[in-house]
Amino acid sequence: MRPSKRAADAMRDVTLERAVARYAEGSCLVTFGNTRVLCTASLEERGPPWLRGSGKGWVTAEYAMLPRATHERTRREVNSGKPSGRTQEIQRLIGRSLRAVTNLPALGERQITVDCDVIQADGGTRTASITGAWVALHDCFAWMRARSIISVDPLKDHVAAVSCGIYKGQPVLDLDYAEDSAAETDANFVVTGKGGIVEVQGTAEMEPFTDEQFLELLRLAKGGVAGLVELQRKAIA
């Protein structure tokens, strides 16, 4: 049995609260159970230097954890001089996921930076970040359209993400920290609203997993993301 007593295919309670940051063009507070992430989308009227003259915009992301988001205080990475390898990996993943569903030429030569700040971590911070970041980005684009900065919505589709794993021999959906820390296999799936796969990250922590187990994890993930996309649709309605 899972520590949370959830069924194998059951997500934690998920909420998406919009317009939580007064000054950001778009914002969302996302919760996956006890994991809470503040996502803010900020418009910059200048794109990255390497895109100047291309007529194309850019969407990027930054990720950070507050010092007491974890059980014990974690030092701020700024004090070490640079982001950790884990932080860089996660923020690149968030950026790739958002760009996969964004029509970049529709932005013009502008950049949107989505900041994902983990307030409380209980597993799945990167998947919660991607899911909430999409809502913040959506609202940023709506803000831009309302002010005639852009004429069309650059978003091509929804995107959301969920973790899956093998816990005590059973494939399960949306691992919390208790499961994640003891899982035999841990995987993250980023999937669009139409079911396209953006990225899969999977690691066997103890024993290698089989093709059949991987396909079951994929099935669980697609079901979980379908539910997350429906929550996104309701949130922006």
From Swiss-Prot:
The keyword Transferase applies. It catalyses: tRNA(n+1) + phosphate = tRNA(n) + a ribonucleoside 5'-diphosphate. CDD domains: RNase_PH_bact. GO terms for biological process: rRNA catabolic process; rRNA processing; tRNA processing. Gene3D superfamilies: GHMP Kinase, N-terminal domain (3.30.230.70). It is an enzyme of class 2 (transferase). Keywords: Nucleotidyltransferase, RNA-binding, rRNA processing, Transferase, tRNA processing, tRNA-binding. Its EC number is 2.7.7.56. GO terms for molecular function: 3'-5'-RNA exonuclease activity; tRNA binding; tRNA nucleotidyltransferase activity. Phosphate binds at residues 86, 124-126. NCBIfam families: RNasePH. Belongs to the RNase PH family. HAMAP family: RNase_PH. Phosphorolytic 3'-5' exoribonuclease that plays an important role in tRNA 3'-end maturation. Removes nucleotide residues following the 3'-CCA terminus of tRNAs; can also add nucleotides to the ends of RNA molecules by using nucleoside diphosphates as substrates, but this may not be physiologically important. Probably plays a role in initiation of 16S rRNA degradation (leading to ribosome degradation) during starvation. Homohexameric ring arranged as a trimer of dimers. This is Ribonuclease PH. It comes from Methylorubrum extorquens (strain PA1) (Methylobacterium extorquens). The lineage of its organism: Bacteria, Pseudomonadati, Pseudomonadota, Alphaproteobacteria, Hyphomicrobiales.
